[in-house]
Amino acid sequence: MACSVDTLAPFLGPNTTNAVAAASYICNQFSGVSDRFVDTGYAIDSTYLLFSAYLVFSMQLGFAMLLAGSVRNTMNIMLTNVLDAAAGGLFYYLFGFAFALGGPSNGFIGRHFFGLKEIPSNSFDYMNFLYQWAFAIAAAGITSGSIAERTQFVAYLIYSSFLTGFVYPVVSHWFWTPDGWASPTNSNLLFGSGVIDFAGSGVVHMVGGIAGFYGALIEGPRIGRYDHTGRSVALRGHSASLVVLGTFLLWFGWYGFNPGSFNKILVTYGASGGYYGQWSAVGRTAVTTTLAGCTAALTTLFGKRILSGHWNVTDVCNGLLGGFAAITAGCSVVEPWAAIICGFVAALVLIGFNMLAEKFKYDDPLEAAQLHGGCGAWGIIFTGLFAKGEFVDQVYPGKPGRPHGLFMGGGGKLLGAHIIQILVIIGWVSATMGPLFYILHKFKLLRISSEDEMAGMDLTRHGGFAYYHEEDPKLGMQMRRIEPTTST
């Protein structure tokens, strides 16, 4: 709203000089107040994005607990989670943020903001880096689960740095920046719609899952995972309690992952001052996220009960996370009832891919490739089917009436764009992470020796087990410091 001296002065009285002076004073004051409101709006949006970044970062603790509970080598897997965050932070600062969001640029890769040079800018501030970094290390954390318990430490360092510094940022540039060739905010939309991968079923989950697939495939299964007849042998993790704790921490963090991807909350839809705005869409996104995860958890519970004959808490946790991974693409543009469909099918996808993994003797300790890669791909297809036109126009304004979900009367163009997204992500990650893992394998930098693997990486590579147990029954469980010994 603007204040005009010429418009306001006639209402202040017949004395023209005083009226003009008074109007000028009032308009100046009004302008100052208006500027403060603008500043307040920026502050609210910045606080919202920062809080969302903190939630997404807390997912690293969830990953750590989930991984620690699902495997036997606790010290090793905890160290790799810390490494993912630390190495990812440095390399995303140096290169990743620039490759992802460094516009103006071409449709393939960004070329500004290396080392956060020229930040803050008109487009981005420091909180954007923090939020995007949290996403990048989430992708690296997904990959670490697939290659757990048999991978050398140097391999973790190399793949994590490469994934967060180059592979993931390029994909996020394609789909999340105005310059990206398939972005829904590009001036030249792919198939007239662009790709709607709102919070990253493809950008984050498929990238991390496919990278993990190649790592686990090239390494081969863990020793003892299949017996001499080829029959599957369950290598259970050491703590179901940590699995459940990690799952709930990830659930909590997902409320920053999906709703936080709006980046702003103080946006009105329609006339200013209405009760319906982006804050409502944020709430709807949290609801769709919740419903998809809950439905997937229950479907997996009963599905696995039918197949295996027992109730398994780990299966339920993985099903829940599979539902979250699937809804991440379309969480902001689908109705709550559609999220239930998303979660139901995501559970079936997860169960189906796990059966294929067993058949082909593929060993992924966390089911990360099946969960994040498979369910992420389904989430992209789901969005192409169920994205609602009204919600799409609100979340991606500027080009009303663009193609939306096939089952919602929006035609098949969005679905076609999403199929292309799946194919290019598979191709890109295959062309980058596949050769990287193969080179590490050829140089004997990928897998540990069979002796170390059988003895346990915690003992052979990390100085001892994560837990100390005193064999004397009178002492029970206790913790103590173990001093290093020197050989004579």
From Swiss-Prot:
PROSITE patterns: AMMONIUM_TRANSP. One of its GO terms (cellular component) is plasma membrane. Disulfide bonds: none annotated. Induction: By nitrogen deprivation. It comes from Solanum lycopersicum. The keyword Transmembrane helix applies. Its main location: membrane. Root hairs and leaves. It is found in: Membrane. It is a multi-pass membrane protein. Ammonium transporter that may be involved in ammonium uptake from the soil. This is Ammonium transporter 1 member 1.
